[in-house]
């Protein structure tokens, strides 16, 4: 399948600066607080979107991008934190699926009974795993496995408005969701794209 209009997202400048510099006939378009850079690469129309950080920003930026530019496909990419010991800095995770690691139900407790996050249970939103597009997944797998020098993993992206730094918590999340890494945007993008029926995929390079 040929994609003529491709929207590529990143939350921060460091995730999109290189891509912006590759654009020919570049045009910057600002909508609300969200920046889009339209141009061409290899005769394809490419839109680079700075989504800003977080699931809500990613959802808004994706909705704007779809409405304004009518992309054939959306690629969400950027950095992520590893959730498995065999995944290291510089490795890449391709998001075959994406899940919400920040949506829980909690047991009822009275005052002074304390709190224990390990007792929290994923709620129905967390269990609604979002899938990447099969054709995109196949294409990305072929390109990265052929050309990338570090390890490439395929699996579930964990995503939510949380920055986990506690190893026991990270291990619990990994055991609960089976995710390979965590970021703060993917779930908003996957959910929005699936609602609009726009093919999408997430690609994350491990930064920590």
Where are these regions (language model features)?
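Proline-aspartate-enriched helix->loop->beta-strand connector
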Residues: 70-75
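Short, acidic/turn-prone active-site loops that include or flank metal/cofactor-
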Residues: 32-34, 53, 97-100, 205-208
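Mid-sequence, gly/pro-rich, charge-dense loop/helix-turn segments that line enzyme active sites
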Residues: 84-177
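A C-terminal functional module that forms or caps the active site or interfaces directly
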Residues: 162-208
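N-terminal short beta-loop-beta anion/metal-coordinating cradle
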Residues: 2-63, 69
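Glycine-rich beta-alpha junction loops
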Residues: 12, 81, 98, 158-162, ...
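Active-site-proximal beta-strand elements of phosphoester/diester hydrolases
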Residues: 46-51, 154-158, 203
């Amino acid at each position: 399948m040929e994609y003529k209009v491709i929207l590529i997202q990143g939350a921060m400048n460091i995730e999109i600066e290189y891509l912006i510099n590759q654009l020919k006939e570049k045009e910057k378009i600002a909508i609300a607080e969200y920046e889009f850079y339209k141009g061409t690469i290899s005769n394809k129309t490419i839109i680079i979107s700075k989504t800003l950080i977080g699931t809500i920003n990613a959802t808004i930026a994706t909705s704007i991008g779809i409405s304004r530019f009518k992309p054939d496909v959306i690629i969400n990419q950027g950095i992520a934190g590893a959730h498995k010991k065999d995944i290291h800095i510089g490795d890449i995770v391709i998001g075959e699926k994406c899940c919400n690691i920040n949506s829980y139900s909690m047991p009822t407790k009275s005052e002074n009974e304390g709190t224990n996050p390990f007792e929290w249970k994923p709620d129905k939103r967390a269990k609604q795993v979002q899938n990447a597009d099969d054709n995109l997944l196949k294409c990305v797998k072929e390109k990265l496995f052929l050309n990338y020098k570090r390890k490439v993993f395929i699996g579930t992206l964990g995503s939510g408005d949380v920055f986990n730094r506690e190893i026991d918590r990270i291990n619990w999340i990994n055991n609960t969701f089976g995710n390979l890494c965590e970021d703060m945007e993917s779930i908003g993008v996957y959910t929005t794209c699936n609602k609009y029926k726009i093919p999408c995929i997430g690609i994350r390079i491990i930064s920590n």
